[in-house]
Amino acid sequence: MNERTSDAFDALLVLSFGGPEGHEEVRPFLENVTHGRGIPPERLDEVAVHYHHFGGISPINALNREIIANVEKELASRDHKLPVYFGNRNWKPFDNEAAEQMADDGVKNALVLATSAWGGYSGCRQYQEDIQGMIKHLESQGQSITFTKLRQFYDHPRFVSTMAQLVQDSYAKLPDELRDEARLVFTAHSIPLTADNAAGTPEDGSLYSTQVKEASALIAEAVGVSDFDVVWQSRSGSPHTPWLEPDIVDHAVELNEKGQKALVVCPVGFISDHMEVIWDLDSELMEEAEKRNMVVERVATVGPTDEFAALVVDLIEEAELKRVIERLGKLPARGSSVNGAPCGDGCCGTAKHKTARVNPNARSAAPAAN
């Protein structure tokens, strides 16, 4: 079943990855993330060190609560009486617990916002699997909710225009003598090439990486930049497995060796400044740039903005059939389905494309993907 319901929705669930909020939560969180994937305990120990460096706290839950508060405000401003719930795949508040609370509150027909703009297994299909898991959990409790996932929004006009403004804000922070020559670089989470090849339906062809590239082109056009780069970050797994390249730090080094003195780095693939952004970009990239006397301005993420909250409510109104779907891109923007149904036959391959995202950076045991 893949049909959209009209305006009978009675709740919104913000569904995310999850992250620890204290030292004692780090190890069990990492064990949840990597359950059944054969990650050695010593590898988890290495990753845990970086969480403890930040007080054992991933910023993702606080950032999602900020998004929820903004969405609630926007819903109220448009006279939507829609309660907002929060659930995570890997840590508290867990998605099954959120689903139970929703059912106890009488919710019957809920919308789901996954905190990802993209297609592909990790960006979309895995959230559909989470929805299937919540449905099974509710059935075991004698309860039921119909869940409708909101679509991928990588090319929504508000996403593009807000990211463009944030890029312009970063250019404005550069020294006058470097502003005109600064190179614009977009970055998103790397995934194995096999997973990217399987992203979307078979006819889509590498939907994840092509969506990232199209979004980057749309943002650059809005900024007025014609020459830019799209690179990747936070890879994990065996170094022998091909992933999307080049890596952001490697790319920055290469540009610097060719004489580039300034970069504007836009983490287009990330909704919020979660652990991968503050570790891979604000720590590793900045440290390398400082060694080379290279100026890097990292663009803010879209999640905390009022415009992102407005985007979310636009998607809700689209699902309610009260608003025309607004898109700037030409690629498929899938992801909207009922009760975790795939977007189409063969969508995002199979479970063999799952990736354990414990170490988002090949150089060191960086924090998990949250």
Curated annotation (Swiss-Prot):
Q: Which residues constitute the signal peptide according to the record?
A: none
Query: What keywords appear on the UniProt entry?
Result: Cytoplasm, Heme biosynthesis, Iron, Lyase, Metal-binding, Porphyrin biosynthesis
Instruction: State its Enzyme Commission number(s).
Output: 4.99.1.9
Q: Where in the cell is it found?
A: Cytoplasm
Pathway in which this enzyme or protein is active: Porphyrin-containing compound metabolism; protoheme biosynthesis
Positions with a binding annotation for Fe(2+): 189, 276
Where does the protein principally reside?
cytoplasm
- Output this protein's name: Coproporphyrin III ferrochelatase
**What's a single GO CC term here?**
cytoplasm
GO molecular-function terms, A-Z = ferrochelatase activity; metal ion binding
Reaction(s) catalysed by this chain, per the record, are:
Fe-coproporphyrin III + 2 H(+) = coproporphyrin III + Fe(2+)
> What InterPro entries has UniProt attached to this entry?
Ferrochelatase, Ferrochelatase_C, Ferrochelatase_N
The positions annotated for binding Fe-coproporphyrin III are 58, 127
| Function statement | Involved in coproporphyrin-dependent heme b biosynthesis. Catalyzes the insertion of ferrous iron into coproporphyrin III to form Fe-coproporphyrin III.
Under HAMAP family, the record lists:
Ferrochelatase (MF_00323)
Q: The organism sits in which domain of life?
A: Bacteria
Lineage at the top is: Bacteria, Bacillati, Actinomycetota, Actinomycetes, Mycobacteriales
Which top EC class is named for this enzyme in its record? lyase
Q: Which GO terms describe its biological process?
A: heme biosynthetic process
Q: Which family does it belong to?
A: Belongs to the ferrochelatase family.
